[in-house]
């Protein structure tokens, strides 16, 4: 997605060979126009999948998930990382290791909002080692729902998360795939495009 790649190049900051800071438009301050375009792109890519619900994780996955849900006409449920006084019982639970925060979080979804009749699109802001996506998949599977695919805003293709998910037969659609963050520079995966005659 060209507009996203340009935003990453112009406003993203490489902090190390494996950390990209995008808090100017995605995971702290949010650019709503960009989120709208991201939502449209996810909706376009998954429109034939009969999605009934989008599942994401708090907090950075919420904005792109809501915009995609708006385009698809479905609801979003986000996995919580913290216990809530209003959500105590009747929860699906999984453990997720955060690469960025270097900690394990227990994530949960209420059983009241997802069931075996749902066809789910999972959306998240980043895909690195795949732990968040695997945790979300576990929650969806515990509910007996089917997974249509996973939509990722930014995939760090140099880490093994995408490979792990694809090897399990999961459809992963990433809007920007980063090949490298070496030497403080963002390099994107280059996909061959069919020649138009």
Curated annotation (Swiss-Prot):
Alphabetical UniProt keywords: Cytoplasm, Glycosyltransferase, Purine salvage, Transferase
Protein's name according to its UniProt entry: Xanthine phosphoribosyltransferase
GO molecular function terms attached to this record: xanthine phosphoribosyltransferase activity
Origin species: Bacillus cereus (strain G9842)
Entry-linked PANTHER family: HYPOXANTHINE/GUANINE PHOSPHORIBOSYLTRANSFERASE, XANTHINE PHOSPHORIBOSYLTRANSFERASE
Annotated transmembrane regions: none
Compartments, record wording: Cytoplasm
Subunit relationships: Homodimer.
Binding residues annotated for xanthine, in chain numbering: 20, 27, 156
Residues that, per the record, bind 5-phospho-alpha-D-ribose 1-diphosphate: 128-132
Name of encoding gene: xpt
GO cellular component: cytoplasm
Function: Converts the preformed base xanthine, a product of nucleic acid breakdown, to xanthosine 5'-monophosphate (XMP), so it can be reused for RNA or DNA synthesis.
Sequence similarity: Belongs to the purine/pyrimidine phosphoribosyltransferase family. Xpt subfamily.
GO biological process: purine ribonucleoside salvage; xanthine metabolic process; XMP salvage
CDD domains in the cross-refs: PRTases_typeI
Chief place of localization: cytoplasm
Record pathway: Purine metabolism; XMP biosynthesis via salvage pathway; XMP from xanthine: step 1/1
Any Pfam family matching the protein: Pribosyltran
Reaction equations catalysed: XMP + diphosphate = xanthine + 5-phospho-alpha-D-ribose 1-diphosphate
InterPro entries, per database record: PRibTrfase_dom, PRTase-like, Pur/Pyrimidine_PRTase, Xanthine_PRibTrfase
Domain of life: Bacteria
Record carries keyword Glycosyltransferase: yes
NCBIfam families with a match to the protein in the record: PRK09219.1 (NF006671), XPRTase (TIGR01744)
EC number in record: 2.4.2.22
């Amino acid at each position: 997605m060209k507009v996203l790649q340009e935003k990453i190049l112009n406003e993203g900051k490489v902090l190390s060979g494996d950390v990209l800071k995008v808090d100017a438009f995605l995971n702290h301050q949010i650019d709503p126009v960009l989120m709208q375009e991201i939502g449209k792109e996810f909706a376009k890519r998954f429109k034939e999948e009969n999605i009934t619900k989008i599942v994401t994780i708090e907090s950075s996955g919420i904005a792109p998930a809501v915009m995609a849900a708006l385009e698809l006409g479905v609801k979003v449920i986000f996995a919580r990382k913290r216990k809530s006084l209003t959500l105590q019982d009747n929860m699906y639970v999984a453990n997720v290791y955060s690469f960025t925060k270097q900690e394990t979080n227990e994530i949960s979804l209420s059983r009241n909002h997802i069931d075996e009749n749902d066809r789910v699109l999972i959306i998240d802001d980043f895909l690195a080692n795949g732990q968040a996506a695997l945790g979300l998949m576990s929650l969806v599977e515990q509910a007996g729902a089917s997974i249509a695919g996973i939509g990722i805003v930014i995939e760090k293709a140099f880490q093994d998360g995408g490979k792990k998910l694809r090897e399990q037969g999961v459809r992963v659609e990433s809007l920007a795939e980063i090949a490298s963050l070496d030497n403080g520079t963002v390099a994107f995966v280059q996909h061959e495009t069919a020649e138009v005659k």
